A protein has these predicted regions:
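Membrane-water interface segments that mark the loop-to-transmembrane alpha-helix transition
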Residues: 1, 23, 28, 32-76, ...
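Signature of the first transmembrane helix
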Residues: 1-38, 62-75, 92, 127-136, ...
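Helix-terminus/linker motif at the lipid-water interface of multi-pass membrane proteins
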Residues: 2-16, 79-81, 139, 198-229, ...
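Helix-loop junctions and terminal segments of transmembrane helices
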Residues: 33-50, 112-113, 223, 227-271, ...
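C-terminal transmembrane helix end/exit motif
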Residues: 39, 106-113, 117, 137-141, ...
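Alpha-helical transmembrane segments of multi-pass membrane transporters/permeases
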Residues: 50, 54, 60, 91-92, ...
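Alpha-helical transmembrane segments of multi-pass membrane transport and lipid-handling proteins
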Residues: 58-83, 89, 93, 133-141, ...
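Interhelical loop/hinge segments that connect adjacent transmembrane helices in multipass membrane
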Residues: 118, 161-206, 241-258
Length: 320
């Protein structure tokens, strides 16, 4: 993903990245409601039957259809608010992503519940190479900012179809509310955490895009993405693996506390020195990865890098 990001940064302008960043902010908000903590609750709950799983799957399918329609219908408001007509087709295309993200929640979660991490790793690796290559080809052919839509849309679609093939679900004429009630007590807290996390991580981009402009947002988004790479790689590796494993010890509070303490120490040992290193090497790293046209992103990247240590330490908290 870093290689693809570096190549696209040399083929597209900051304004393109800023425009897509705004669309991504809104799609991420709707994405919160595609999951509502269901994935974590399915992993945690050991008493769900196959029928419960199927009914919850149907709930996510209906929610995906509704959210896609709502986001599609709100694209005009988003484009008018930011006074950028390019946002209209971009957001409309991304609305498809909501359906795949929602409908794929249950079958994708079953990989983690069954601890099939090897398959997940290979699936992610192959999809990243495929969609990354397609994005680069599209950029070279002059697709412009639409290049940046290839990865999110194709990735979610491929993950959905691969997961559904591995864990097929029947189409039932139900909302699955009775089965959803079995996990709601747990999933509700995960959902509220996701809502809080969303505004903490996205409010800055919304304000920059509205009051400063798309090009400055592009510079900010690029520095933020580069800063987030080590955090995301650690989070995406640790959290999905920890949660299904720790769920086996959910009644052993002392053991969980000991594991949490060791995890925090390890992440602090990695995170804080890494943040300091990124701060002092920020200029060289930014120019090497993205090229000279992204030089205005350097001060922002250096400031953001100071938070890397704390964010890495907190990255595993959701698993506990």
């Amino acid at each position: 993903s870093l290689v693809v990001m570096a190549i696209l940064a040399r083929l597209l302008c900051p304004d393109d990245f800023g425009t897509v960043a705004i669309a991504t902010v809104f799609i991420n908000f709707f994405s919160i409601f595609t999951n509502i903590g269901i994935s974590s609750a399915i992993v945690q709950n050991k008493e769900l039957t196959s029928l419960d799983i199927n009914r919850i799957y149907m709930f996510t399918v209906w929610i995906g259809i509704i959210l896609s329609a709502l986001f599609f219908s709100s694209t005009g408001f988003i484009a008018n608010y930011y006074q950028d007509n390019r946002l209209l087709p971009i957001c409309q295309l991304l609305s498809v992503n909501l359906f795949f993200a929602s409908a794929g929640t249950v079958p994708n979660t079953l990989f983690f519940k069954d601890k099939d991490f090897k398959f997940i790793a290979w699936r992610t690796f192959i999809i990243q190479i495929l969609v990354g290559a397609l994005a680069i080809v599209a950029a070279l052919m002059g697709a412009g900012l639409y290049t940046l839509l290839i990865q999110p849309i194709l990735s979610s679609a491929l993950i959905y179809f691969i997961s559904l093939r591995k864990y097929p679900q029947k189409l039932l004429w139900t909302w699955g509310i009775d089965s959803l009630k079995k996990i709601w007590a747990y999933s509700m807290y995960q959902f509220l955490f996701s809502v809080m996390s969303y505004f903490i991580r996205n409010l800055d981009k919304m304000l920059i895009g509205k009051y400063i402009g798309m090009a400055p947002l592009g510079y900010y988004e690029k520095s933020y993405r580069l800063m987030s790479l080590p955090i995301q790689n650690i989070t995406y590796v640790i959290t999905p693996v920890l949660h299904p494993i720790l769920s086996d010890y959910q009644k052993e509070e002392k053991r969980l506390a000991t594991i949490n303490e060791r995890m925090v120490r390890l992440l602090a040992f990695i995170g804080f020195p890494l943040g300091i290193l990124l701060f002092f090497c920020g200029r060289e790293l930014m120019l090497f990865v993205f090229g000279p046209q992204w030089e205005p992103s350097i001060p922002t990247f250096q400031i953001l890098s100071l938070s890397v240590g704390l964010q890495i330490v907190m990255s595993s908290s959701g698993s506990f």
